[in-house]
């Protein structure tokens, strides 16, 4: 077995990693245990903080000890997180599971994409990265779609059963991580952790194409993801609560379809235009959905995940092409933590604005700012790849 099989295993690894049944009801499960929404949201916050603290250290370690080891450890911790949650009947074990889940997110962030890129480098297929990454994205978005639908049915009978059933696909994902072959196409890392980190920062700053695209993508992620988390409050004015899960599932399905189209569109109009125009379409349709302010809002908003599925693989490919192998995971982790910080700031901004005005104005402001931020990506795309 060699690295040429890695993309195939990565597709199915991502499918089973995201084929979970608790996505639509996780906060409801936490609340069923804790009977307190503030404490329930604390579990989410703990997972986010854990990921943020560990993201850069794990990225540096990945560049030094190898991608496969980090991937296996990430699969183990993700499985352990859900095992602990399945057995939890109080706050402390839920918190412990969240901290371990955050570590799993940090281990996967940057590392798994770097593993794919290095594997394609081994087989001299780097130019196929966009096509293969888009296919992997399509797989895991379809897994989220299927998991959300099945999970909604299972949770109707037992929310804890939905958590327990997650253990099965995550065990399969762990098994798939063990058959991955460590790529050889990886330059020697810097001599120390500090130099590794500094080298990644310098690359981000000195490479103007990478700097602007990564900054625009991180700000877009923060604004759009925080708005997406809050969107249910706005949409619940127009549809019953049970329909929110259906619209969320359809969003994953359309995202999967968009990812399937991404490489085809890039072949026709170029990867830069696919990334830039896709971002604009994503944010524009979000604004239109808010302006509808009616039953049409959740329907129009379904165009957003379709556009996201198209532009996300293109942006990821552009960023990957600008990073040297020796600092790949480190650089991706820095970019990821920037996006997480933007998410935290945007979430506070949206919540505060909703309190003093309304969810309508808060979401309209967030999506409008995101549309303006797209200009950073277009500035970056003007510079040629190094």
Protein language model features and the residues they cover:
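Helix-to-loop junctions at the C-terminal end of transmembrane segments
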Residues: 53-66, 155, 257-271, 354-355
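Transmembrane alpha-helix termini and helix-breaking/packing motifs in multi-pass membrane transporters
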Residues: 32-33, 85, 144-165, 233-239, ...
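Helix-loop boundary and gating motifs at the non-cytosolic
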Residues: 1-53, 206-251
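Helix-loop junctions on the cytosolic side of multi-pass membrane transporters
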Residues: 166-192, 379-386
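C-terminal ends and interior cores of transmembrane alpha-helices
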Residues: 76-89, 280-293
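Cytoplasmic helix-loop-helix junction between adjacent transmembrane helices
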Residues: 99-141
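Juxtamembrane intracellular "pre-TM" segments in multi-pass secondary transporters
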Residues: 1-4, 181-216
């Amino acid at each position: 077995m060699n690295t040429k099989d890695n993309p195939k295993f990565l597709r199915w690894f991502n499918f089973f990693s995201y084929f979970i049944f608790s996505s639509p009801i996780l906060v409801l499960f936490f609340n069923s245990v804790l009977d307190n929404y503030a404490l329930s949201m604390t579990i989410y916050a703990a997972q986010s903080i854990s990921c943020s603290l560990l993201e850069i250290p794990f990225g540096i370690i990945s560049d030094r000890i190898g991608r496969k080891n980090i991937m296996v450890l990430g699969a183990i911790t993700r499985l352990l997180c859900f095992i602990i949650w399945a057995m939890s009947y109080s706050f402390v074990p839920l918190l412990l599971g969240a901290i371990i889940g955050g570590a799993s997110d940090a281990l996967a962030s940057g590392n798994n994409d770097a593993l794919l890129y290095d594997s394609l480098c081994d087989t001299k297929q780097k130019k196929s990265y966009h096509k293969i990454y888009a296919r992997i994205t399509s797989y895991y978005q379809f897994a989220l779609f299927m998991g959300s639908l099945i999970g909604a049915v299972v949770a109707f009978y037992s929310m804890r059963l939905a958590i327990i059933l997650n253990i099965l696909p995550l065990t399969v994902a762990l098994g798939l991580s063990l058959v991955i072959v460590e790529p050889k196409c990886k330059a020697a890392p810097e001599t120390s952790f500090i130099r590794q980190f500094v080298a990644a920062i310098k690359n981000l700053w000195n490479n103007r194409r990478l700097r602007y695209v990564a900054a625009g993508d991180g700000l877009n992620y923060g604004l759009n993801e925080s708005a997406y988390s809050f969107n249910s409050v706005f949409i619940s004015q127009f549809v019953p609560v049970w329909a929110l899960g259906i619209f969320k599932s359809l969003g994953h399905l359309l995202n999967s379809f968009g990812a399937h189209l991404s490489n085809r569109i890039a072949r026709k109009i170029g990867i830069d235009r696919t990334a830039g125009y896709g971002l604009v379409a994503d944010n524009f349709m979000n604004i239109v959905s808010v302006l509808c302010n009616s039953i049409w809002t959740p329907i129009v908003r379904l165009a957003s995940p379709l556009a996201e599925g198209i532009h996300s693989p293109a942006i990821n490919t552009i960023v990957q092409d600008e990073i040297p192998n020796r600092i790949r995971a480190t650089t991706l982790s820095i970019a990821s933590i920037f996006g997480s910080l933007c998410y935290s700031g945007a979430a506070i901004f949206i919540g505060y604005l909703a309190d003093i005005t309304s969810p309508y104005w808060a979401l309209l402001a967030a999506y409008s700012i995101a549309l303006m931020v797209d200009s950073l990506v277009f500035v970056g795309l003007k510079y040629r790849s190094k």
